[in-house]
Amino acid sequence: IYHYTTMKKVFLIFLSLIFIFTFQVKAITLEDITSGKFQSKDIAEVYPSADGVHYFTATNGNTRIVKCEYRTGHEVDTLFDVKTARECNLEQFDGFSLSPDEKHLLIYADSEPIYRRSFKATYYTFEIRRNLLKPLSDGGKQQAAVYSPNGRMVAFVRNNNIFIKKLDYGTDCLLYT
């Protein structure tokens, strides 16, 4: 009998807990759904460093590119700042990518959407060691700029033509029309 009453008490406690927690749940309304209450939060774009210890990200409303430590999240170094970069007339930028050797940045600004995820923008190359920002090319906005595997050239599209910019010489040549 003792075992039966103990089981009965445990069952009643368990049942009452279920009812308590069930009735405390707030109903989801249409307003909750349409207001974006359950919308996921984006994190800033993060580019991992080759050393595996650091990452690069844009801060201050896309006016700086900093190197941070994964372990602490603290800034270790500033790679680019629109206020201190030489020959920089940008107030802010829209995005960036890092060369494979991590000596140059490809920074773009004044983006114009084309279709879904594609866009045209004014691209710039930034030499980190010299703190110098230069336009990638003259002649209009570029698309799909990407570094070569060795980081010495940048391929891009302008007016449906494919170009290559040789960073060592500062020249760009038409590759395919």
Question: Model-flagged regions — what are they?
Answer:
Residues 34-64:
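Beta-strand-rich domains and repeat architectures in extracellular enzymes and scaffolds
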Residues 50-51, 100-101, 149-150:
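Residue-level detector of Asp-centered blade-edge/turn motifs that repeat once per structural unit
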Residues 54-55, 105, 151-154:
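Hydrophobic beta-strand positions that form the internal "hydrophobic ladder"
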Residues 58-82:
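Beta-propeller domains
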Residues 70-72, 128-131, 167-170:
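Short loop/turn segments that connect beta-strands within beta-propeller blades
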Residues 74-102, 112, 140-141:
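Blade-loop segments of beta-propeller domains
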Residues 115-121, 157:
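Short, solvent-exposed loop/turn segments at conserved positions within beta-propeller repeat blades
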Residues 176-177:
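Conserved small/polar residues in nucleotide/adenosyl-binding loops
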